[in-house]
Design a protein with these regions (language model features):
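Non-heme di-metal
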Residues: 1-222
């Protein structure tokens, strides 16, 4: 198997449809002021459809998180060099793969529970692209600190949506996955400190990459 797998070669069946993140950002429907409102509020007429779309986004995001964590286990030789990953980091990422695989299964079943199906909404691949930076430290800040941190807000939103609509299944599952995301963020922060303790320039570059991913994922980078 080759290392540093390109995003174009991700394995997907015919149900999946891919879209570039810039296409989503500049979609006229998303630029409409009404699209900036809380589309999951109980009094919002399309809240159920919006929730299904968000759930599908969580599902494909968890697939990419699994793929990205797995690539970090495989892409780098074990070691302490800049182009290597310590064995302990690879082990932590292997553990995270188990979490992400569980999240994929849960999210897929939640999609069914909410009346959605795989491929009903398009997939964009920002998460996997951030997860496959050539520097393992930038992977940590781009995914574990930035995207996993933002995922905490997403899971909270879906948990609260489930509570407001009296759906204990959705609320419980989102709260369960939320607990894992907190540990992923902490793991990324811990390894960032360890790997850049004697390299402030590398730490600066990693934090700048985190900010860039934050802006991009929050639709503020274009």
């Amino acid at each position: 198997m080759k290392r540093f797998w390109p995003v174009t070669d991700l394995a997907r069946d015919e149900r999946f449809q891919r879209i570039r993140i810039e296409d989503a950002i500049f979609d006229p429907r998303n630029l409409n002021p009404e699209a900036q409102q809380n589309g999951l509020a109980p009094n919002y007429e399309t809240s159920s459809d919006n929730a299904r779309g968000l759930m599908h986004g969580i599902f494909v995001g968890e697939i990419q998180a699994l793929e990205g964590a797995g690539r970090t286990c495989f892409d780098f030789e074990a070691g302490n060099g800049r182009d290597e990953a310590p064995f302990g980091l690879k082990l932590d990422m292997a553990r995270q793969c188990w979490d992400e695989a569980r999240h994929v299964e849960i999210s897929c079943k939640l999609g069914d529970h909410m009346g959605s199906e795989i491929g009903e909404f398009a997939e964009q691949t920002l998460l996997f692209e951030a997860a496959c930076n050539a520097d393992p430290v930038l992977r940590l800040t781009g995914v574990n600190r930035a995207l996993e941190g933002l995922a905490i807000d997403v899971f909270k939103t879906m948990r609260d949506f489930g509570s407001s609509f009296g759906d204990p299944v959705l609320s419980f599952c989102e709260d369960w996955m939320l607990a894992d995301e907190v540990t992923h963020v902490k793991m990324g922060s811990d390894w960032l400190r360890r790997l850049t303790a004697d390299d402030p320039q590398r730490q600066k570059e990693a934090l700048e990459f985190q900010k860039a991913v934050d802006k991009l994922f929050s639709f503020g980078g274009f």
